[in-house]
Amino acid sequence: MPEEALLKLYDEHHRLKLTIDPAAVVYVAADSNYINVHYLENGREKVFPVRNSMKSFEEAARRHGIVRCHRSFYVNPKHIRLLSRGKDGIIYTLFNVDEMGKVPVSKMYYDELARLL
């Protein structure tokens, strides 16, 4: 895979922390001062924490087709099986890999995400 096609994640001091095929990324979650990258490696879920903000991840996400679905989450639409409304009324993503859990989708981002599926 060409170097420019890889997703490169830097920490808050601009040090390279993770280089990954963007197709392997399932979702990214905010956790205090970290972003947790949930990705697949050999069919299994891995999580890699990077000390940085969602705002700083935004440009890299856009370049690689990873979209925001909530103030605390980005998702890769290629891994989404469907969008489902829970009993609590919240819309969630369900992924192709069941072990990945589910991620909330806010009303603000729903239309864009639904259009990509």
Where are these regions (language model features)?
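Basic, polyanion-interacting recognition surfaces, primarily
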Residues: 1-117
